[in-house]
Amino acid sequence: MPEGPASAVTYPGDVSRIVVLDYGSGNLRSAERALRRVGADVTVTADRHAALEADGLVVPGVGAFAACMAGLNAVDGPSIIDHRLAGGRPVLGICVGMQVLFDRGVEWDERTDGCAQWPGTVERLKADVLPHMGWNTVSAPVGSTLFAGLDADTRFYFVHSFGVRRWEMEVSTAIRPPLVTWANHGEDFVAAVENGALSATQFHPEKSGDAGAAVLRNWLRDVVG
């Protein structure tokens, strides 16, 4: 799986302490390297205390939804995510790490409960060619933090066969709705979500070269702070 180049930079201000949650899934070292390149102090660990106390928590994920949820449950991941968000502490999900934030995943008729941070179902995309593997543009909403400063034709690296095909959260005038970014591979699917302290991307920023580095830098600066 190719990784585009990402230039090393010095992150301005205080260094953010980031934990990449090690629950047996995900491109842990790729995520660690990408975050270090944009100036973060990164620890890869399953330790609950470290995950709760970090400035930001990254939840990566590759493979099957059910396997990722089993790994998360084994390290008390859903509780860690809940506790962080209750305190307004940033969490970033990547690829299947985004998918498990939804209510449920359905793979080959097997249904698995997710972390239920957002309503919705992860299911197989209706595309002629799967997996969706390679570079693709996204359609980010006005006001996006993650994609600030990036052109509309910027491409990100995807590799997945399943995704969120419908956004199911009802709009409420009482709260600010999440910002949802879309991409298309045979049909539209959710490419990213920005919801206060909770952010997620279906694509791999750690494998998306300078574009992915910009997304991670925006997250560190404007969400983690």
Regions found by a protein language model. Name each.
Residues 51-61:
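Short acidic/histidine-rich motifs immediately flanking catalytic phosphotransfer sites
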Residues 187-194:
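Short, surface-exposed beta-strand/loop micro-motifs that present aromatic residues
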Residues 103-183:
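Pocket-forming structural segment of enzyme catalytic cores
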Residues 10, 198-225:
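Acyltransferase
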Residues 63-135:
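Cysteine-nucleophile active-site neighborhood
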Residues 14-19:
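Extreme N-terminal starter segment of soluble prokaryotic enzymes
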Residues 153, 194-199:
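Beta-strand-turn-beta hairpins that frame and shape the catalytic cleft
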Residues 42-53:
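Short acidic low-complexity segments
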